[in-house]
UniProtKB/Swiss-Prot annotation:
The gene is nedA. It comes from Micromonospora viridifaciens. Its EC number is 3.2.1.18. Induction: By N-acetylneuraminic acid, colominic acid, and sialic acid. This is Sialidase. CDD domains: FA58C (cd00057), Sialidase_non-viral (cd15482). Coiled coil: none annotated. The keyword Lyase does not apply. Its main location: secreted. Residues 1-37 form the signal peptide. Belongs to the glycosyl hydrolase 33 family.
Length: 647
């Protein structure tokens, strides 16, 4: 189940498995259409699962009350380097933070003493260094550690300028080592990577940069940055070097509402950008470059990668794989796979250059913020992450991840309580192995009836199946996220789909009336309450000093007359303010004459959807009148409104 409270959890989950239907398999496998060409299994099966972890830095020990922001890499000699912030005041830039480092010479089993790469200064004038990111030139052996240099301003407060002596500019620094990270030289590159004087702030995305292996830009070093442009928008930009780090330049800034972002080289030499979304969509943003990271195409939302607006990591599982090979398409991704909190630390695997992510496993179900991955010389992987108590290192292999390259889809579906629906299952076996007896396991409520079948999986081909779901008559209306796991002898793949029960289609709705909406200073459009995304919200007008206060109202046109029996309210997810308290609900057949209130009451501060129910009635319009706010504030904000009724 999802951790997003907007999607209801199915109570007391039961795992229901379905074996393939032999008759269906015999009838269809021979005619299965070819999938993406696969030359052998991209991920080798077998081996004993491995997952170990240990703390490298614990808050309050070894001189610093707080440690944050992990970076991880392997030196050309095979040593493992871990870098992170030591924060004497526990705050981000501007603060007297230091860039620290520990080294392992035995593949991460043991670690040397904590050392300083760039030392902050706690006495006036205060200076600090934060947010490390490693980048290794595999051709020369040079190691770079990019980080922030702050004096008086952090990312939000930095002003335009590039003078290294200006204390009100947040600067870009890079430390360089030619002896495997034992000693470092330092320089400020703010002017080098600021082609537009309107860029008033920048910082390197912590973790690890990349070096391209394929095509005309092979050897290029790329480190990702986030900048604030003249309009105040957060944009992503690749900073790169074609002369082994002697000089650095910035490519074209991309997107809006970006934040910490990473890149990975795809099997054909294109560069995939994967970004935190400061606009809070609840997912990762992605874009693709065809010119080695200088510029990027359109930015889109990857709805296979839920994210709570957090830093993440994306790498090639087999960094030395030949261009175009099956292994070159295998990517690993780590993040906090929740849309509402920094938790549920998860590693995912893609076998098709990030088009799908069928394999996932949780490594930290509790608190987990930033993380970074790197491939180790012995074929395992290093993971450095923030568990909430400092910096922790983990070592794992693909056998522990336990996946098979077989992405599958089950479409979202809507039905009424007491109804039954059958939906198709489509599986693409990207692996080079046959799976004669796959099974499908679904997380289902114990009172839901589910039946299904899946064909055998042939190498490089598509397979079909189906799932039939019967929802009891008394099921509470809502959107239910159902997890599905394809289980095979070679490993598992997973996906989710949404079963909508007893709710009208938001896509057919429109805003009939609203007392005010904030569009000048933020995206507080009223239409956000029917966009299906709880990360967006309607906000009443606030940018004018004389903006109206309570009561507030918003009315929906349902797109036709329906028999309805309730309204579901979801509060704004990322703020404790502007929460509706007392309310009234009205309905109308024509949008002019209103009946009611048909329901009234007081909402709580819960993040989950809250129901206001009333006797079933025919209506085309429904109105929420907000009478008060939970803490007495003047404004109102609503993430989503759903209408209970018959479609």
């Amino acid at each position: 189940m999802t951790a997003n409270p907007y999607l209801r959890r199915l109570p007391r989950r039961r795992a229901v498995s379905f074996l393939l239907a032999p008759a269906l398999a015999a009838a269809t496998v021979a005619g299965a259409s070819p999938a993406q060409a696969i030359a052998g299994a991209p991920v080798p099966p077998g081996g004993e699962p491995l997952y170990t972890e240990q703390d490298l830095a614990v808050n309050g020990r070894e001189g610093f009350p707080n440690y944050r922001i992990p970076a991880l890499t392997v030196t050309p000699d095979g040593d493992l380097l871990a870098s992170y912030d030591g924060r004497p005041t526990g705050i981000d830039a501007p603060g007297p933070n230091s860039i620290l480092q520990r080294r392992s010479t035995d593949g991460g089993r043991t670690w040397g003493e904590q050392q300083v790469v760039s030392a902050g200064q706690t006495t006036a004038p205060i200076k600090g260094f934060s947010d490390p990111s490693y980048l290794v030139d595999r051709e020369t052996g040079t190691i770079f550690n990019f980080h922030v240099y702050s004096q008086r301003q952090g990312f939000a407060g930095s002003r335009p300028g590039t003078d290294p002596a200006d204390p009100n500019v947040l600067h870009a620094n890079v430390a360089t080592s030619t002896d495997g990270g034992l000693t470092w030289s330092h320089r400020t590159i703010t002017a080098d990577i600021t082609p537009d004087p309107g860029w008033r702030s920048r910082f390197a995305a912590s973790g690890e940069g990349i070096q391209l292996r394929y095509g005309p830009h092979a050897g290029r070093l790329i480190q990702q940055y986030t900048i604030i442009n003249a309009a105040g928008a957060f944009q992503a930009v690749s900073v790169y070097s074609d002369d082994h780090g002697r000089t650095w330049r910035a490519g074209e800034a991309v997107g809006v509402g970006m934040d910490e972002n990473k890149t990975v080289e795809l099997s054909d030499g294109r560069v995939l950008l994967n970004s935190r979304d400061s606009a809070r969509s609840g997912y990762r943003k992605v874009a693709v470059s065809t010119d080695g990271g200088h510029s990027y195409g359109p930015v889109t939302i990857d709805r296979d990668l839920p994210d709570p607006t957090n830093n993440a990591s994306i790498i090639r599982a087999f960094p030395d794989a030949p261009a175009g090979s099956a292994r070159a398409k295998v990517l690993l991704f780590s993040n906090a796979a929740s849309q509402t909190s920094r938790s549920q630390g998860t590693i995912r695997m893609s076998c098709d250059d990030g088009q799908t992510w069928p394999v996932s496993k949780v490594f930290q179900p509790g608190s987990m913020s930033y993380s970074t991955l790197t491939a180790l010389p012995d074929g395992t992987y290093g993971l450095l992450y923030e568990p909430g108590t400092g910096i922790r290192y983990a070592n794992f292999n693909l056998a522990w991840l336990g996946g098979i390259c077989a992405p599958f889809t089950i479409p979202d579906v809507a039905l009424e309580p007491g109804q039954q629906v059958t939906v198709p299952v489509a599986v693409t076996n990207q692996s080079g192995i046959a799976v004669p007896k796959p099974s499908l396991q679904l997380d289902a409520s114990p009172d839901w009836q589910v039946q299904g079948s899946v064909e055998p999986l042939m190498p490089g081909r598509q397979a079909k199946g189906q799932v039939t779901i019967t929802v009891p008559a008394g099921t509470t209306p809502g959107r239910y996220r159902v997890g599905a796991t394809l289980r095979t002898s070679a490993g598992n793949a997973s996906t989710t789909f949404t079963v909508t029960v007893g709710l009208l289609d938001q896509a057919r709705m429109s805003i009939a009336d609203v007392d005010s909406e904030e569009t000048a200073r933020e995206d507080g459009r009223a239409s956000n309450v029917i966009d299906g995304n709880p990360s967006t919200f309607w906000h009443t007008e606030w940018s004018r000093a004389d903006a109206p206060g309570y009561p507030h109202r918003i009315s929906l046109d349902l797109g036709g007359t329906h028999t309805i029996s309730g309204l579901q309210y979801t509060r704004r997810q990322n703020s404790a303010n502007e929460q509706v308290a007392d309310y009234e609900i009205y309905t109308s057949l024509n949008g002019t004459t209103w009946d009611g209130p048909v329901a009234s009451g007081r909402f709580t501060t819960s993040l989950a959807p809250q129901r206001a129910v009333f006797p079933a009635r025919d209506a085309r319009y429904i109105r929420l009148v907000a009478l008060s706010e939970q803490t007495g504030h003047k404004y109102a904000a609503v993430a989503e409104l759903e209408v209970e009724g018959q479609r």
